[in-house]
Structures are given as structure tokens and as C-alpha cells.
Amino acid sequence: MESYFPATFFFCRCLKYMSDYTNCLLQGYGVLPSAPTKVRVPHIDVEFAIIDWDTPNTLADTVQHYNIHYRKMATYDNEYHTIPKVHSPFILEHLSSNSDYEVYVEAVNSHGVGEPSARVVFRTENKVRNTVMCN
């Protein structure tokens, strides 16, 4: 009797990459938007930042919404958090003060998710500000 465990095990491990594989194929067909351009952080505060970007150079007219991915740097989990279905400008809230964050944006159309934008790193403001004491 033949064992199907190895093939099934490896197949299941690959399932989590299927959306990436599909997006790669669709990029080749030219139906996905290119990466959003000029991602910037024009305003940074203690617990929030405003993220802004321009439309993709390719297939911008097909974009339905954007996904923002962000993570706090120098932490143990270093996992990206995703906020789907947003538009520019976007207020990224509930951040920690005096912390470094990395953010990137993806454009989404009816065919799938396009290439990610360039990553942008920023630091939130410090909650405790230095004050000068006058005598």
C-alpha cells in the first residue's frame, strides 16, 4: 500500500503561497496594477501617522482600493499587519510613541493584488518632550 503522506504534506505546505503564485502569473499577463508610487509620510505624531501615495504608473484606472502593510521595527514578532481596502491619504492609528515603523502599499483591482510599493521607514514622535526650565 502506497503512502500519500509526503505528497499531501508538501502540497498543503505550498497552499499558503498560492495567492502569491497566482499574482505572479497575473503580473505576467499584464492585468494587475503596478506598484503605487511616491509613498510618503507627510505628518507623524505620537500615536499616528498620515500615509500618502500616488497611483500606479500602469493600470491606475483599474485600481479598486489599496492595502497597507506596516510593522513596528525591532520587535520580536516583526510581522506585518495589513489594513485592507484603504485609499490615500490614510491615517495609520494606534502606533507606539518614539518607535520606528516600516510601511508599504499595494494596489488591488478585480484581478488581484499588484506589486508592493517601495518600503518607507518613519519614527513616531516622543510622548515625553524635553522641556527647558527657566530660573
Regions found by a protein language model. Give the residues of each.
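Short hydrophobic targeting helices and cationic amphipathic motifs
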Residues: 5-6
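Extracellular low-complexity, O-glycosylation-prone stalks/linkers
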Residues: 1, 11-93, 100-135
